[in-house]
Amino acid sequence: MKNVLTILSILVSIQLNAQTRIIVDVNGKGDYRTIQGAINSLPDSSATPRVIFIRKGVYGEKIYIEKPNIIFEGEDRKATIIIASIARDEWRCGHTDDWGVATMNVGTNDITLKNLTITNNFGFDFKEKTIYCASDTTANKERNLRKDGHQMALRTMNMATRLKAINCHFRAFGGDTVSPWEIYNGMWYFKDCIMEGGVDFYCPRGWAWAENCEFISHTGPAAIWHDGSGSKDSKTVLVNCKFKGFDGFMLGRYHREAQFYLINCEFAKNMKDTPIYRVQTTNTINWGERIYYYNCHREGGNDFAWYKNNLPADINAKDISVKWVFGEASVLSRLSTRSWMLSWTYDTSKPKVSPYTMIQS
């Protein structure tokens, strides 16, 4: 009897831990032709991750993700493309919030993106357009859509947190391409990604880590942005990242409380000699200017003085890790963050940071 119970226990454990895997193929050779169809087929919740494997192809659809614990894995980053054309200025004329403003709209926790290109192509395929907009402040209620207006490829809402993107390409011409927004519990992890767009095209709120990422600025007065107003500990950390763009592109700015750390980053030689700056608004900044650099350089040399090493005295570059970033955030969220407990080790013989390793805790 004891052996029977043991076997049953093992079988139940295997069943509970079995990972659901759905295949999406735009040509009809999978379980679903559309990504949204695959999402809709899943139960509303799950204790273990569900995998939606997306085969090569162009998926012309706007994605809404409201079910947690899903891994979206593309077959090939360059060939697995999710694309939609959305101008935020037009969307908000008929909607009271941003739900649906992006190519990928995330309203839940524990979402992982792998090997995908996610594009909002409104600005790339721009055609002049004037629309009627009931909420517009002009007398005739007409609004001219702009090529460089807000065009989100990724937008999180509804207090979503713990999103990871690995080897993904986020594309837009206009602003706010990558918008993970949740100031109190937001935890965002990006590795080996490419992000491109206009003003503030990488604009996390809360806690964010970006490693080995490339940022391409098409237009606008800043590439990166941060809102850390939910907690003094909030921060955006960029490690081993590269920045390039149009001649005279500017690195970053902020409107609210913010905290930036740039470690081992490389800037293109055509970047403007302008530090990350505060935009003057009526917002009160209580925690001061907190913009830190370590071992950052300009392509070809001739570095600008404003990004010289300036880490706080109590912080060593080798201690800056994923675990360091999300430590207090994990307490605030009151949720298990085992999969977030990652760190990298520092080899003093090399100028760069070694690949991260998982910490089992």
Features from the language model and the residues they span:
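Bacterial Sec-dependent N-terminal signal peptides
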Residues: 1-20
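Sequence-level preference for short, compositionally simple segments enriched
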Residues: 20-361
